[in-house]
């Protein structure tokens, strides 16, 4: 991996940065990498905004009123800044997808902001911050010509160890699907895939920092493609086989996937790789073919159901989660009933569900037949009740089983530890074990969103 250009920037001594992160796992990853870049310049992370010399708000633009939430935060930061003295000034920056979408508008509405940086430009954060410290207002939302990942410093080993034994690793960014409800193609750009070399190098850095479980990230992660050292074209399944060979790694996951890109090699990886956890987040959004077409999802409900069956045949113990949108423009009662029917057929271990909210710049925002808010609320309530019932059923179905659990942290009470089940849901155990070990745990009980277990008899 090439060394970061940020190393040419003079170090900044004894400064503290606080990053507030909204949104998806990739935003969490991006915030961590921003911290790495700033750490290389002498910044240390603080969990207290009042202690910070620099506050960054890393934003998400997926849901309704994302910009308003940002401006509300910025109003509070403005008051915090006014209380500062000249001996401890406060710099304020906005990053992420709202930064990309709003750009100069953020400075117009909130002049207290010093810099606005889009998700493809945060590798330049140290140099942009230096310019802002000299009094220049920064808006950098272009798409970088250079590969940003080649210009990020290596992971800060101590910071990785502090975060825990599970880590995210971005392998793919952007989306070319252009679903009519989604802003991702406009805020994250076209699909790009990181090289096998980059990914392997970063995975090794994480493993050397005691990470045991890596989740590969992408807006359309199973759209990843690359080349092996001998020039063969690889898809995500091939990459998983490759990473599974790394010494010290105990678990692999990936998210988020599009049904159209679930190819045979990826399904085979679920069948053949024990290191690949039996959990898959596979959004569908609706069970109505008419609505799926209006959303430009590029598949029908039966295609999704057939895919679920094929994956379950390959890995019978797999748990599925999904995404659902109710109240998309033109959705009728019959369309909604088709979604309910699909959920009943699949049986999810967990899921995310939302009311449709028009996103500026998307085709969905211009569609007629917008659904009444009360209807959306009623449908969402019914859908979430069904999904919650399925989650409870899934949790209870595991009682009495013994499964391997990755121990992640100490529990709330003395003598208690918390681990991660293969199905992603947490497990609370009254025992002691080193963080990072994988233990055989018998599930003895379940709450609404976690398991309770005990160390299995050997």
From Swiss-Prot:
Recorded GO cellular component terms are: cytosol
Start and end of every Radical SAM core domain? 161-393
Q: Where does [4Fe-4S] cluster 1 bind?
A: 24, 60, 97
Q: Where in the cell is it found?
A: Cytoplasm
In this UniProt entry, which cysteines form S-S bonds? none
Kindly list the GO molecular function terms attached to this UniProt entry: 4 iron, 4 sulfur cluster binding; metal ion binding; N6-isopentenyladenosine methylthiotransferase activity
Pfam families, per database record: Radical_SAM, TRAM, UPF0004
UniProt entry keywords in alphabetical sequence: 4Fe-4S, Cytoplasm, Iron, Iron-sulfur, Metal-binding, S-adenosyl-L-methionine, Transferase, tRNA processing
Needed co-factor(s): [4Fe-4S] cluster
CDD domains according to UniProt = Radical_SAM (cd01335)
SUPFAM superfamilies in alphabetical order: Radical SAM enzymes
Q: How does it assemble?
A: Monomer.
The job of this chain, per UniProt, is described as: Catalyzes the methylthiolation of N6-(dimethylallyl)adenosine (i(6)A), leading to the formation of 2-methylthio-N6-(dimethylallyl)adenosine (ms(2)i(6)A) at position 37 in tRNAs that read codons beginning with uridine.
This chain's protein is named tRNA-2-methylthio-N(6)-dimethylallyladenosine synthase
Taxonomic source organism: Bartonella bacilliformis (strain ATCC 35685 / KC583 / Herrer 020/F12,63)
